[in-house]
Design a protein with these regions (language model features):
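Intrinsic-disorder-associated, low-complexity terminal segments enriched in Asp/Asn/His/Tyr and depleted
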Residues: 3-5, 16, 40-42
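Residues flanking N-terminal targeting/processing segments that define the start of mature chains
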Residues: 5-9, 13, 25
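Positively charged N-terminal leader segments that act as targeting/secretion signals
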Residues: 20-29
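A short aromatic-anchored loop/beta-hairpin motif
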Residues: 44-228
């Protein structure tokens, strides 16, 4: 008798990987665990799992200092490449100080931190905010969550800041096929984006909370070698 009946999920991965990935994409969360001889190629990951908006959750073995224990909101993904914002990496710069350096006044809690959004274009500001405001260089990410990427947009938002607003310097970028390769090699877990985690008041908790939402104990992931 075939052992596939004992392990129906593993059997489905091997016998019908496309069907399995489609089901996974619509589940509450999904953890892609690669293994030798995997039959799901990168194009399946590209088309089914990596549609924005999505959370990319770094595994503990990802030791790149730009992404160690990071949670990335994937905001754009196409055949040409991908763009994301690291949502849980505050830096020692307050939003009031940053706005003052740009000749603006922040009319909200000026002590909240600026965040490092990624290693690309770190001199450029990106603003995630929950509002109905349609401003210049602003795109809808999900629901009322919008991403603005110009100082003109920021100048409009700081006058009457919405309850949920975070400012990031830089973004995370991947070239053609690069992100899918990193996912299949086990550097990232993939999960649906969660608005509450994006604007979580304590960014130090975001990584563990994101894993717990997937039903994963972080300690269970800490027993293998590093991923670069």
């Amino acid at each position: 008798k075939s052992d596939s009946n004992k392990f129906p999920i593993i059997s489905e991965i091997w016998l019908n990987p496309l069907s399995f990935l489609k089901k996974a994409a619509f589940s509450r969360s999904f953890c892609l665990v690669p293994f030798p001889g995997s039959r799901y190629p990168n194009f399946m990951i590209e088309r089914i799992l990596l549609g924005a908006p999505t959370f990319l959750i770094a595994v503990p073995q990802l030791v790149d200092p730009n992404f160690f224990r990071s949670v990335v909101l994937l905001v754009e993904h196409s055949d040409e490449g991908s763009m994301g914002i690291v949502v849980n990496r505050p830096i020692e710069l307050e939003i009031g100080e940053f706005c003052a350096s740009q000749d603006m006044t922040f009319n909200g809690d000026a002590t909240q931190p600026i965040f490092q959004g990624g290693p690309v274009q770190t001199d450029r500001a990106f603003i995630l905010h929950e509002s109905e405001q349609e401003g210049p260089e602003t795109e809808t990410v999900m629901g009322n969550i919008r991403l603005s990427y110009s100082l003109e947009s920021l100048s409009m938002l700081v006058e009457e800041p919405p309850e949920h607003l975070k400012v990031f310097l830089g973004y995370a970028g991947w070239g053609e096929g690069q992100l899918a390769e990193e996912v299949t090699t086990g550097a990232w877990l993939v999960a649906p984006a969660d608005v509450q985690l994006i604007f979580q008041s304590n960014p130090d908790d975001v990584w563990e909370l994101a894993l717990h939402q997937m039903g994963i104990d972080p300690l269970q992931l800490m027993h293998s070698g590093s991923v670069h």
